[in-house]
């Protein structure tokens, strides 16, 4: 795991596993809402009434609907696929 993903992957994986509703703001200002179904190095699959593949390069901010507790650093992160 590269250093840049040491926070991103566990955070997204926690949101996915706990099915936390999120708002994703894109760099062009558009707001998307749903639950993270899956993710990889380049994209997030966001599910609401439809599934949308969102490229991470287009994302500005990910805002969970409730506070999220990250797993402790001594546990390895699981892959982002369901």
Swiss-Prot record:
One of its GO terms (biological process) is regulation of DNA-templated transcription. CDD domains: Hfq (cd01716). The keyword Lipid biosynthesis does not apply. PROSITE patterns: SM. Transmembrane segments: none annotated. GO terms for molecular function: RNA binding. Keywords: RNA-binding, Stress response. Residues 9-68 form the Sm domain. GO terms for cellular component: cytosol. RNA chaperone that binds small regulatory RNA (sRNAs) and mRNAs to facilitate mRNA translational regulation in response to envelope stress, environmental stress and changes in metabolite concentrations. Also binds with high specificity to tRNAs. Belongs to the Hfq family. HAMAP family: Hfq (MF_00436). This is RNA-binding protein Hfq.
């Amino acid at each position: 795991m590269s250093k840049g993903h040491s926070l991103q992957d566990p955070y997204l994986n926690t949101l996915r596993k706990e099915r936390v509703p999120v708002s994703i703001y894109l760099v062009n200002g558009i707001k998307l809402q749903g639950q993270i179904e899956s993710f990889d190095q380049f994209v997030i699959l966001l599910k609401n009434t439809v599934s949308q593949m969102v490229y991470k390069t287009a994302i500005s901010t990910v805002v969970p609907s409730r506070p999220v507790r990250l797993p402790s650093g001594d546990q390895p992160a699981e892959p982002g696929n369901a």
